[in-house]
A protein has these predicted regions:
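Extracytoplasmic
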Residues: 17, 48-50, 60-63, 70, ...
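Sec/Tat signal peptide C-region and signal peptidase I cleavage site
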Residues: 7-15
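N-terminal (or domain-start) structured segment
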Residues: 14-85
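Pocket-lining segment of extracytoplasmic ligand-binding domains
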Residues: 80-82, 91-95, 121, 158-256
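An extracytoplasmic/periplasmic, membrane-proximal ligand-sensing/linker region
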Residues: 171, 178-179, 188-206, 216-219, ...
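Short beta-strand-centered segments that line the small-molecule binding cleft or hinge
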Residues: 84-90, 101-107
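Ligand-binding clefts/hinges and TM-proximal coupling segments of bilobed small-molecule sensing domains
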Residues: 132-149, 223-284, 289-292
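Bilobed "Venus flytrap"/periplasmic-binding protein-like clamshell domains
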Residues: 19-45, 107, 111-178, 273, ...
């Protein structure tokens, strides 16, 4: 697995340092730089708190949660819907049962469910995906999970498509522009390197994800929200794209110490202006929203302690 070299800045290892790893996603998504941004700020003050942070590129949300549960990751970035399902033992986590030791740390950027199609494919709305070659994402990724939820709501299955490929997020833009697929899906913060690649390497369009099935998902699930991808963000897409989405969240478990999580949260929140500049998807973040939006597992004790120390109001559900 890839580790961000910039996160392991050469410095003497202090006896007693605690090493922690954050699981992220594919290197072209926003989870990887999200983990890197967190680690950069944490490692800046490691001489005072003794926590050293590295980033691992992984298969995404579901993988991160399962690996935290297995005790092989300390923290991970995960979509808000998969945080909910893991804590409650529903959907993909029904067989494993409720992960009651899962803990929320904070939420990060909104993640619209994004459908990109080749301009010559004739795909202009959700229904047009029928009978086309669509990349539904690799098993274990958040986008694959969300695509399956959407397909279920629409009464679709893999046979709805001429081809349902299972490429990783880092592979799908090239496949689209090489005409191996007609459309790809990605649950991602914007602007995204992967979507930029797809819209600059070939003529491709963002597709509105709307209709009764989508309205029902948003109405019946607190972790979904309507979302808009601004027009003009990507080449050849001057108009707003309307869809639904989740949010990126940082999660851990009760197995990770209060000191470690307190140090990580403090590193981000006390360098907040710097954090917001580390990726365009962070530009509009607000501390008050980050400690509540999309969090369904209880707050980790280390996070809750920091928020109380600085006077940030925690919702009763998260104590």
């Amino acid at each position: 697995a890839a580790v961000l070299s910039s996160m392991t800045v050469s410095a003497p290892v202090i006896a007693g340092d605690t090493f922690v790893t954050i699981g992220t996603g594919g290197v072209t998504g926003v989870y990887y730089p999200t983990g890197g941004s967190i680690c950069r700020l944490v490692n800046k003050d490691r001489a005072s708190h003794g926590v050293r942070c590295t980033v691992e590129s992984t298969g995404g949300s579901v993988y991160n949660i399962n690996t935290i549960r297995a005790g092989e990751l300390d923290l991970g970035v995960a979509q808000s819907d998969w945080q909910y399902h893991a804590y409650n033992g529903t959907s993909k986590f029904a067989d494993a049962g409720a992960f009651t030791d899962l803990r929320a740390v904070f939420s990060v950027h909104p993640e619209p469910f994004t459908v990109v199609a080749r301009a010559d494919s004739g795909i202009r709305n959700l229904e047009d995906l029928k009978g086309k070659r669509v990349n539904i994402g690799n098993p274990g990724s958040g986008q694959r999970g969300t695509m399956e939820v959407l397909m279920d709501a629409l009464g679709w299955d893999k046979s709805t498509f001429a081809l349902a490929s299972e490429l990783k997020s880092s592979e799908q833009s090239k496949a689209l522009c090489d005409n191996k697929i007609d459309a790809m899906v990605f649950t991602v913060g914007h602007p995204s390197g992967s979507i930029k690649e797809a819209t600059t390497s070939c003529d491709s369009v963002l597709v509105n994800v709307t209709g009764a099935a989508v309205d029902g998902l948003v109405a019946n699930n607190d972790f979904y929200r309507t979302a808009t991808i601004p027009g003009g963000m990507y080449n050849g897409n001057p108009d707003d794209t309307v869809t639904f989405g989740v949010g990126a969240t940082v999660v851990s478990s009760t197995a990770t110490s209060e000191h470690v999580i307190h140090s990580i949260v403090k590193g981000v929140f006390e360098n907040f202006d710097s954090f917001k500049k580390l990726h365009p998807a962070f530009a509009n973040l607000k501390k008050e929203e980050m400690i509540s939006d999309g969090l369904s597992a209880p707050l980790h004790d280390g996070a809750a302690r920091y928020y109380k120390e600085v006077g940030l109001k925690i919702g009763r559900a998260h104590v």
